[in-house]
Amino acid sequence: MAYQSLRLEYLQIPPVSRAYTTACVLTTAAVQLELITPFQLYFNPELIFKHFQIWRLITNFLFFGPVGFNFLFNMIFLYRYCRMLEEGSFRGRTADFVFMFLFGGFLMTLFGLFVSLVFLGQAFTIMLVYVWSRRNPYVRMNFFGLLNFQAPFLPWVLMGFSLLLGNSIIVDLLGIAVGHIYFFLEDIFPNQPGGIRILKTPSILRTIFDTPDEDPNYNPLPEERPGGFAWGEGQRLGG
């Protein structure tokens, strides 16, 4: 019975969030079980372009370090904000969500050529947090019961938290920068006088990921919507 409940809950996670989170967990599990090593996964331009180890373009986004506090913290944020985006502003737009993944991953890989980062998964999570926070500007947040602020400040609060823990803020800055570029090109620039939509999801992605339009006369049975994580007043991060 418990297995069926867990399976049902897992299958209710929207597809992109489910696939990415699962890939991250399985990759970390494989490293933990010593089936593979981080040296086979990290971002290395020379190995990618000279030795054709193309898989590193993907695997460097899937490993968040050994199982521990940092891994759990990153997985919680990745799952929550990826799912909230997919169930919120990208609801019914799976192809657009996949295109955001590809665009963000491409930019981070490009910037990764100039900074000494070997794993980009955490920066990718910050990008997701940034886009969600800018699209939900009036949501009130509470950080460990210490700070109250509106959602757009969340990426900067997380960067300050990283700084307090003695971590490099390059990862956070990269995620914020890529998130802002996407948000500007997708949400701001097209709505400016003379602005145009630069980011256009390729039709092949729509063919693969978007379901055909339903018959407008079809009246489906009501179904329970999967529970999201729409944090509002009084909701604590990490608590």
From Swiss-Prot:
Lumenal side: 79-96, 172
Spans traversing the lipid bilayer: 58-78, 97-117, 151-171, 173-193
Residue ranges with Gly residues bias: 229-239
Keywords, sorted A to Z: Endoplasmic reticulum, Membrane, Transmembrane, Transmembrane helix, Unfolded protein response
Pfam families: DER1 (PF04511)
Membrane topology value: Multi-pass membrane protein
Region of interest called Disordered, as start-end residue ranges on this chain: 214-239
One annotated Gene Ontology cellular component of this protein: late endosome
GO molecular function: signal recognition particle binding
Localisation: Endoplasmic reticulum membrane
Tissues in which the UniProt entry reports expression: Widely expressed, with lowest levels in brain and heart.
SUPFAM superfamilies: Rhomboid-like
Protein induction: Up-regulated in response to endoplasmic reticulum stress via the ERN1-XBP1 pathway of the unfolded protein response (UPR).
Ranges per topology, Cytoplasmic: 1-57, 118-150, 194-239
GO terms under biological process: endoplasmic reticulum unfolded protein response; ERAD pathway; negative regulation of retrograde protein transport, ER to cytosol; positive regulation of cell growth; positive regulation of cell population proliferation; retrograde protein transport, ER to cytosol; suckling behavior
Entries under InterPro entries matching the protein: DER1 (IPR007599), Rhomboid-like_sf (IPR035952)
Subunit structure, interactors included: Forms homo- and heterooligomers with DERL3 and, to a lesser extent, with DERL1. Interacts with the SEL1L/SYVN1 and VCP/SELENOS protein complexes. Mediates association between VCP and EDEM1, as well as that between VCP and the misfolded glycoproteins. Interacts with OS9. Interacts with SELENOK and SELENOS. Interacts with the signal recognition particle/SRP and the SRP receptor; in the process of endoplasmic reticulum stress-induced pre-emptive quality control. Interacts with CCDC47.
Family: Belongs to the derlin family.
Function per UniProt: Functional component of endoplasmic reticulum-associated degradation (ERAD) for misfolded lumenal glycoproteins, but not that of misfolded nonglycoproteins. May act by forming a channel that allows the retrotranslocation of misfolded glycoproteins into the cytosol where they are ubiquitinated and degraded by the proteasome. May mediate the interaction between VCP and misfolded glycoproteins.
Name the UniProt record assigns to this protein: Derlin-2
Species of origin: Mus musculus
